[in-house]
UniProtKB/Swiss-Prot annotation:
Keywords: Ribonucleoprotein, Ribosomal protein, RNA-binding, rRNA-binding. Belongs to the universal ribosomal protein uL6 family. PROSITE patterns: RIBOSOMAL_L6_1. This protein binds to the 23S rRNA, and is important in its secondary structure. It is located near the subunit interface in the base of the L7/L12 stalk, and near the tRNA binding site of the peptidyltransferase center. One of its GO terms (cellular component) is cytosolic large ribosomal subunit. PANTHER family: 60S/50S RIBOSOMAL PROTEIN L6/L9, LARGE RIBOSOMAL SUBUNIT PROTEIN UL6M. InterPro entries: Ribosomal_uL6-like, Ribosomal_uL6-like_a/b-dom_sf, Ribosomal_uL6_a/b-dom, Ribosomal_uL6_bac-type, Ribosomal_uL6_CS. GO terms for biological process: cytoplasmic translation. This is Large ribosomal subunit protein uL6. It comes from Chlamydia trachomatis serovar L2 (strain ATCC VR-902B / DSM 19102 / 434/Bu). NCBIfam families: L6_bact (TIGR03654). It comes from the Bacteria. GO terms for molecular function: rRNA binding; structural constituent of ribosome.
Length: 183
């Protein structure tokens, strides 16, 4: 059972939560998100707090879904209130990025430019041709798109060239040792 899920989720001002049938919907200044609820959890809204508890009919490990849905709802609340952002930096000679309409155009050292469609609900911007900023209200969508962009050219361990998250540590390897002439 999750220890965090024992605490209620406090709703910031301007965020509303509503539950209809098996679906929770969170609305805030940045937009709205919905999530289908599992039968193993019960959600209660009291004032400006949301409580997540295991359902009474669940006998086998009653708290196993409680932590998951607590985290999902907390991320929804944070997303509609402040939003999420992932920043990627491109390191390498000739590496560039540009946003063209609903496409992210990457020049990453291959013979052709790589074009990636930007999912709806995300805002992508490029600074200084090498810094990509991905913003949105859905934490999963922001992280998934950032991981897809990074996967196009992950940083290599010898020179560190590639696409990496901002402030990501890339473990470096030593190159081949120079010939010494000894036999």
């Amino acid at each position: 059972m999750s220890r965090k899920a024992r605490d209620p989720i406090v709703l910031p001002q301007g965020v509303e939560v509503s539950i209809q049938n098996d679906e929770i919907s969170v609305k805030g200044p940045k937009g709205s998100l919905t999530q289908v609820l599992a039968k193993e959890v019960e959600i209660a809204v009291k004032g400006n707090e949301v409580f997540v508890a295991p359902a009474a009919h669940v006998v086998d490990r009653p708290g196993r879904m409680q932590g998951l849905y607590w985290a999902l709802i907390a991320n929804m609340v944070k997303g509609v209130h402040t939003g999420f952002e992932k920043r990627l930096e491109m390191i390498g000679v000739g590496f560039r990025a540009a946003v063209q309409g609903s496409l992210l155009d990457l020049s990453i050292g291959v013979s052709h430019p790589t074009k990636m469609p930007i999912p709806t609900g995300l805002e992508v911007s490029v600074e200084k041709n090498t810094l990509i900023s991905i913003k949105g209200i859905n934490k999963q969508l922001v992280g998934e798109f950032a991981a897809c962009v990074r996967a196009k050219r992950p940083p290599e361990p010898y020179k560190g060239k590639g696409i990496r998250y901002e402030n990501e540590y890339v473990r470096r390897k030593a190159g081949k040792a120079a010939k010494t002439g000894k036999k």
